[in-house]
């Protein structure tokens, strides 16, 4: 299926605005672009309470988090890790998505503002992500926990689920992996398909990896490339969404299949006509609403 019409028009607008590819920017320039895109999504639903938190990191540093509490008694906690190749992205840009998930699921959402590369390279993002999980478990006790994220945030969700299993960490009811980075192989079929070089390109992924984990040996470790973990048995149930026109499509689907083979319950869906980053484009791309509904229904299923 070709790209849907809304996506075609969105990309046309970006082209007319003269937006350069991310890999031709500095990290600071790329982060500024992310902030501009975030302004397009609107304010999101009202929350009963919004709190800013400071989480202590495992290396002695700290990072922020935003806690979005919907009306009513929370049914669970969603710890959400934003995308951005471990280099860009901030919780302000994902506030609308977080509010939408909180409103639709009745869960408290914790947006983790983990530290970014190249200022904080591998393994900082994964370590911060796990610290956010343990903070949520301690600060919001007694509620089932879902870890979720898109792109690099999907990578962090998978990494956190692996570590929680291995270290007998906080129990995770569900892992939501939206077009996740699961491997450092940049030469599979979805990477080399010209039709997938859209919002995220192979060159941009090289740029992200070079900033985050310049050492090739580090990239191949399971806490950077979870597809390379030897054993995926005993992990929490997973929802894996991929986009048809995305360089990350094949590795996300390969991870879903590995999970299945390990006996993990998996719901996997390839979103037809969609490109990378569509999930977070609330109120901009119609495909976002459909994918969010899939995620909400999966979360409802584990919280019943």
Regions found by a protein language model. Give the residues of each.
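Catalytic active-site module of serine/aspartate enzymes centered on a nucleophile-bearing elbow/loop
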Residues: 285-304
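Short beta-strand/loop motif that positions the catalytic acidic residue
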Residues: 240-242
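A glycine/proline-hinged amphipathic helix-loop "lid/cap" segment
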Residues: 1-67, 304
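Gly/Ala-rich beta-loop-alpha elbow adjacent to hydrolase catalytic centers
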Residues: 149, 153, 157
């Amino acid at each position: 299926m070709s790209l849907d019409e809304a996506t075609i028009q969105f990309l046309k607008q970006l082209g007319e605005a003269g937006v350069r590819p991310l890999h031709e920017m500095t990290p600071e320039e790329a982060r500024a672009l992310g902030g501009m895109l975030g302004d397009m999504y609107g304010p999101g639903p009202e929350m009963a309470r919004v709190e800013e938190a400071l989480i202590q990191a495992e290396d002695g540093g700290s990072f922020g988090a935003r806690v979005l509490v919907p009306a009513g008694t929370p049914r669970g906690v969603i710890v959400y890790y934003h995308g951005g190749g471990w280099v860009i992205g901030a919780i302000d840009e994902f506030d609308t998505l977080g509010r939408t998930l909180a409103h639709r699921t009745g869960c408290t959402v914790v947006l983790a503002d983990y530290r970014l590369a190249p200022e904080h390279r591998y393994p900082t993002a994964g370590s911060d992500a796990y610290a956010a999980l343990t903070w949520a478990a301690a600060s919001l006790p007694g509620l089932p926990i879902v870890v979720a994220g898109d792109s690099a945030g999907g990578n962090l969700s998978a990494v956190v689920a692996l570590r929680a299993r291995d270290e007998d960490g906080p129990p995770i009811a569900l892992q939501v992996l939206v077009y996740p980075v699961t491997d450092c192989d940049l030469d599979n079929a979805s990477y080399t398909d010209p039709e997938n070089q859209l919002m995220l390109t192979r060159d941009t992924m090289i740029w992200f990896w070079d900033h985050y984990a310049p050492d090739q040996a580090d990239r191949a470790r399971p806490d950077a490339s979870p597809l390379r973990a030897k054993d995926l048995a005993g992990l929490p149930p997973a929802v894996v969404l991929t986009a048809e026109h995305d360089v990350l499509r094949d590795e996300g689907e390969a991870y879903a299949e590995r999970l299945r083979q390990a006996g993990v319950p998996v719901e996997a869906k390839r979103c037809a006509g969609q490109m990378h980053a569509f999930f977070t484009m609330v109120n901009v791309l119609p495909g976002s609403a459909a994918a969010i509904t899939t995620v909400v229904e999966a979360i409802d299923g584990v919280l019943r």
